[in-house]
Amino acid sequence: MAIIFNPNKKIFTLQTAHTTYQMQVDRLGYLLHLYYGAKSTCDMDYVLTYADRGFSGNPYAAGMNRTYSLDTLPQEYPTLGTGDFRNIALDIKNEQGTESVELLYKSHEIRDGKYALKGLPAVWASDDEAQTLEIVLGDDIAGVEVHLLYGVLEACDVITRSVLIKNTGSGNITIEKAHAACLDMVYGDYDVIRFYGKHAMERNLERTHLGHGTLSFGSRRGTSSHQYNPAVILAQRDTTENAGDCYGMLFVYSGNFSCEAEKDQINQTRLLMGLSDELFSYPLAAGETFTVPEVIMSYSADGFSQLSHQYHTCISEHVCRSRFAHEVRPVLINSWEAAYFDFTGDTIVDLAKEAASLGIDMVVMDDGWFGKRDDDNSSLGDWFVNEKKLGGTLSELIDRVHAQGVKFGIWIEPEMVNEDSNLYREHPDWAIQIPGKLPVRSRNQLILDFSRKEVRDNIFDQICAVFDQGKIDYVKWDMNRSMADVYAGNLAYDYVLGVYDFMERLVTRYPDILLEGCSGGGGRFDAGMLYYSPQIWCSDNTDAINRTRIQYGTSFFYPVSSMGAHVSAVPNHQTGRVTSLKTRGITAMAGTFGYELNPALLSDEEKEEIREQIKTFKKYEMLINEGTYWRLTSPFEDEVAAWMSVSRAKDRA
């Protein structure tokens, strides 16, 4: 049994292959956190210490005991209004404006299998691979019931957490803050590792000592963002790649998020991850339930490499659902850097001919095939084929490409609309904007309100009408701006659920299409997206040297098989740097591998080198994608970037 309950001590113990997680319902009914770390068979309630500390108040139920305070005790799910003045996981406001919820234990259930979340991506597993613990806490006066969900995947050494918030009262309540996970550490001196960046330079590792106070980061952009990835590592100060304690949290969500790390007045550490409380105020009527997206937690006593391996296994085996997750994927060439908007059907066919001669498996027609789109100023929202530009129907073009012996892929950006489009002229209210105000433009486009079903249905029907015209093998889903015009506190969350609904319908209808996520490169590179698409374009920056840093940071949580990586032309279109074709090829092989250039401009020698690159990649592709990935150097600290893939059987490298 991975989950054990001791009824005498009221201790819950969650066991994985190498870790133990423990919590206890105390005599007053509060759920206290005891331990998370290396595997143990001991009860850890001895870690709880009680002391009378000035200005740390005491629950009324504690009577005259001034040593009992929620301001100092480690808690499993702390709330506002209980005398805990640290950062909290949950804040709920009632109709009178009062913000106070005191959660006490009511019941629990242990069951085989992994819980699922309605409308949200989550780790999945068979009944013999996982167990679920559901603990019900409640505040009858506030009319709130909270269900803490724990999924234990023993073999992966991961524990997942999510929360259901139920309005059990007769009035309305408003959720002002909702995190999925809280980890209170009584002892230890920690560093916080986060992954910051910008467009075309995502997921740079930054390690900071956690001093007193709060270190926080997140996104308010409507997506998980280029700027901060929804992932964090809490590590002992001497932890390295191959030694030392470290804890990871990874948010399975593609929208606004928040991570808070706090060292309190008595040197205890609290780590929180969940939904951002900025631009968030979610109304919940009587009888309704709100679901907080999932956090995947993992612990390693053997440094960052082992922690990464645990996350890589979890994501590839229990997050990605696509049939392509463990298949050989096609080496593709994308038309974007080869032609940008300036192409015809003949251009794509010529690209296919060149690709076939090089051993490339697939040609992808990027932005510019629909509406009247010859630049980025028009036609988003008008998903009909520009047959004049292509010189025929899409079906005819697909057949011509397939006739060259290569597969066919296409680019879409379903969440966006241009003001210069038929869709916007007919439905201007479908674009997200604050009533009475002019919207914020970005890349000359607005965001469609995917929180509305009629909007999603219209775009879905348009996209399906395109996909049904021929055998499309691959789709690149892009999303090229941040959300600015947030007109309501529920919009950002409901928008993401709308995107997930659209994606679920799409992959269900077209299970044989390989879907690759993208948001200006890696602006939505998260576990939520990987639930629907087994790979994501890692960055719009294809410079080989910069990519070593981007892919290095990405590898701390995400497997190589998820990283879209291509060989591009030189001078590089983003940086102007010139690197050898060999260097570009090696870097791209630490990902899904493909090309982003015009092969007609290559010399015969370069073409022959590409043929050899593709042969090499195909020889080692399954080893790279399915093997164990090791970071050998840090491109941020060392003069060289080096990595290694080792087979699961440890007989190849």
Question: PLM features: what roles do these ranges have?
Answer:
Residues 91, 98-105, 282-301:
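Short Pro-Gly-centered flexible turn/kink motifs
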Residues 324-464, 474:
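Aromatic-lined carbohydrate-binding/catalytic grooves of carbohydrate-active enzymes
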